[in-house]
């Protein structure tokens, strides 16, 4: 009996700790993404180390925006702020004019599809890898997402279609095929915003270029933000911003100038990279 009572109180303590550490829901307003995302002089840092310094950025809905810059410049931090995983230390982020902190954060995140750098696939079917077992998603939803990701053609050619087993870590598929399935996973919930965080870095140039063309075709129905050092994702973007020393600088003119100047491109008197 004493052992059972001890286990009971240990469980109660664990539940209380989990409830205390639970993330608050944020604001009460229902989010939508119909107009634009705006960063207004947003700053963030870790301790005394500043990461973002009074960043201003406007992303119109339905456009493709690329963020470039050296490792550690704060590109992922900027995405974490947008996903409400972090909170600005000063400044604000507005979604259609509404401060992000006033929105229900869980509903806001449901509007976001996120594709990370590392491709993680289960040793299971293509269907399971797209839906991740979500009972709200059907085979029709998976097919739609795979079509959007440019993957349906190769899925149809497999012997078992959606029920095809991809192998350990997707080993039965090519790198491009694996990446398209991960993108389809992000698209399955019909996001309004798709974030690509170095999502094509492991692909060969031909596969990367094909996927970038597919991602561009998602606009204007979906807003796309891509973090990348690679030319293919930059060349298809409507706007390109370089994050350097905590500040955002817009690259104007021919995109080749980014590769001509590199990550330490000079800044003109207007705060933009000089045009060719």
Protein language model features and the residues they cover:
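An intracellular "coupling" helix at the cytosolic face of ABC transporter transmembrane type-1 domains
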Residues: 3, 13, 17-20, 43, ...
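ABC-type nucleotide-binding domain
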Residues: 30-276
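Pre-NBD coupling/linker segments of ABC/ABC-like ATPases
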Residues: 20-32
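Cytosolic ends of transmembrane helices, especially the final helix of ABC transmembrane type-1 domains
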Residues: 1-14, 125
């Amino acid at each position: 009996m004493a052992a059972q009572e001890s286990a009971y109180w240990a469980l109660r303590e664990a539940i209380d700790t989990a409830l205390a550490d639970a993330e608050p829901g944020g604001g009460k307003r229902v989010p939508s993404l119909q107009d634009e995302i705006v960063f207004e002089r947003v700053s963030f840092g870790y301790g005394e180390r500043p990461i973002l310094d009074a960043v201003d950025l406007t992303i119109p809905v339905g456009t493709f925006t690329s963020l470039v810059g050296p490792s550690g410049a704060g590109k992922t931090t900027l995405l974490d702020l947008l996903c409400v995983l972090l909170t600005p230390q000063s400044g604000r982020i507005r979604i259609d004019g509404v401060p992000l902190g006033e929105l229900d954060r869980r509903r806001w995140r449901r509007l976001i599809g996120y594709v990370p750098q590392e491709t993680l696939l289960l040793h299971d079917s293509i269907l399971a890898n797209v839906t991740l077992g979500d009972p709200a998603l059907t085979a029709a939803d998976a097919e739609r997402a795979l079509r959007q990701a440019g993957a349906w053609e190769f899925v149809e050619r497999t012997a078992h279609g959606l029920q095809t087993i991809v192998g350990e870590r997707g080993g039965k598929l090519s790198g491009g095929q694996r990446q398209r399935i991960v993108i389809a996973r992000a698209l399955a919930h019909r996001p309004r915003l798709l974030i690509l965080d170095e999502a094509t870095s492991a692909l060969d140039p031909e596969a990367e270029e094909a996927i970038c063309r597919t991602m561009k075709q998602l606009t204007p129905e979906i807003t796309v933000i891509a973090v990348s050092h690679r030319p293919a994702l930059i060349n298809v973007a409507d706007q390109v911003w370089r994050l350097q020393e905590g500040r955002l600088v817009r690259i104007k003119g021919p995109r080749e100038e980014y590769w001509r100047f590199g990550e330490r491109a000079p800044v003109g008197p207007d705060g933009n990279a000089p045009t060719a």
